[in-house]
Amino acid sequence: MIKKATLLTAFSVTAFSAWAQDTSPDTLVVTANRFQQPRSAVLAPVTIVTRQDIERWQSTSVNDVLRRLPGVDIAQSGGTGQNSSIFIRGTNSSHVLVLIDGVRLNLAGVSGSADLSQFPVSLVQRIEYIRGPRSAIYGSDAIGGVVNIITTRDNPGTELTAGWGSNSYQNYDLSTQQQLGENTRATLIGDYEYTKGFDVVAKGGTGMQAQPDRDGFLSKTLYGALEHTFSDRWSGFVRGYGYDNRTDYDAYYSPGSPLIDTRKLYSQSWDAGLRFNGERIQSQLVSSYSHSKDYNYDPHYGRYDTSATLDEMKQYNVQWTNSVVVGHGNVGAGVDWQKQTTTPGTGYVPEGYDQRNTGVYLTGLQQLGDFTLEAAARSDDNSQFGRHGTWQTSAGWEFIEGYRFIASYGTSYKAPNLGQLYGYYGNPNLNPEKSKQWEGAFEGLTAGVSWRISGYRNDINDMIDYDDHLQKYYNEGKARIKGIEATANFDTGPLTHTVSYDYVDARNAITDTPLPRRSKQMAKYQLDWDVYDFDWGVTYQYLGSRYDSDYSAYPYRTVKMGGVSLWDLTVAYPVTSHLTVRGKIANLFDKDYETVYGYQTAGREYTLSGSYTF
């Protein structure tokens, strides 16, 4: 409570009276500037998803959670567990930084982008989602935005959940948090998920050979955490989790060769930390280790056959973050150290390599009357490409009580991945991709409607593209992204409304052609209400047209995929104070659409679940 009260006083959040009505004083955000601050004091657009939201939406995957959020466009090669890409504000999927409890997701080190189709939604207790550049705070990848998945559970007790659904879907979950003495608490989560899936078809991606089979998914997850409070100011934690996933997919068929159409992923992560929370100073030291083994193989031969591939990576992280209350704001500073190592063959790199990065950052936030000022700078020293610096600044002006104008500018970058550097077609002389981004926004509270309208431009240079003639990767691409984002939320009696609209013009700046797999327009609407103890929810999504490549034709051609409107319906009912039953119909009107050309989506799906708490 000392920490919370100090922060609220330091930022003088009473000046933001309008936002205080929309955001509880208890709603604190960590991800925006790497220290706790009230959401009303954050100048960047931020969305928070809680475990209660996930349960109300009855989401069975992290992608299903993220697709509801402003600025997020997801392209997936089929159903649950199939490869997916996350585009935030039109940027590449490799331009999205995904954190797990503040630490980079290990799987992103091989491909350069995070595929959240494999991460268990059962571990997600909270998501903090920041849009816009954040490399000045986090380093590489944070061009389009940052998604921080937080696994720390806050509510004690035990919950048992079981669910069933279409395509033989099954899910069984146990989560418990217990107090061990006065100052120690332990958390344990176990989860099993299975679906037979459906035939994703993969037109054009199978070597002209149809593969009429079900492409299923199996996941087993285990999580444990121990937290201890040493005193009023000192606390520490140890936690670890792992998951074992198997995915069937449609693969490229070559006559006389094994058909590699099965993926087996083992992933484990461990971290430990020590925290100090003083009246004016906060400090945290975290050390983490993660190890992933990603096999692709023909099940008739097994994952140890010479035809199989293995991407294996180990990642070591040490983070020391600090913040000090200064005046009517805060100054933060910290150091990040990371080492990534791979085994031979990972990412088609014939030899094993390691890459080290040390980053030092400084942040500042001050509230001066009606003005809020924010700035950050960072320097990264990478073992491959040397030093790289980034910076950003923002200013907010409450020109009328309850109405604020925000302007920001930031630079960011994306480091080349190991395959681009050292693979068969790699180029060790690659430079990082660089971004410059501008944004202007108005936000306010009008007649009970909390709203924000933003306009932004993002120029990305030195993008890494594969040169067909030279058969190497080079820094020769450019992108120009312009967009408008509007969000609003309000209540009308028992009804709660959340609305967003995105217009994104993402183009190749050299050819002036649209970037693939991005919708030019998106509209999203969430309606929730309670009637006679029934908790109802309706989700609407409009995904505009997008472009992709048809590889079934030679030479391949660009195709335009039409837009689609999707509806989901959910309902939950508390049978007793301990037992709740839930039901969901996804894609209510059974729309046939694709987000990756040639790959089918699920169509209408049903799920039914029950949870018992004690």
From Swiss-Prot:
Function: Involved in the active translocation of vitamin B12 (cyanocobalamin) across the outer membrane to the periplasmic space. It derives its energy for transport by interacting with the trans-periplasmic membrane protein TonB.
GO CC annotations, alphabetized: cell outer membrane; pore complex
Annotated residues for binding of cyanocob(III)alamin: 85, 92, 110-111, 251, 309, 517, 551
Family: Belongs to the TonB-dependent receptor family. BtuB (TC 1.B.14.3.1) subfamily.
Organism: Salmonella typhi
InterPro entries: B12_transptr_BtuB, Plug_dom, Plug_dom_sf, TonB-dep_rcpt-like, TonB-dep_rcpt_b-brl, TonB_box_CS, TonB_rcpt_b-brl_sf, TonB_rcpt_CS
Name the UniProt record assigns to this protein: Vitamin B12 transporter BtuB
UniProt short sequence motif TonB box, positions renumbered to this chain: 26-33
Domain TBDR plug positions: 38-152
NCBIfam families (alphabetical): PRK10641.1, TonB-B12
GO molecular function: ABC-type vitamin B12 transporter activity; metal ion binding; porin activity
GO biological process, one term: monoatomic ion transport
Record-linked Pfam families: Plug, TonB_dep_Rec_b-barrel
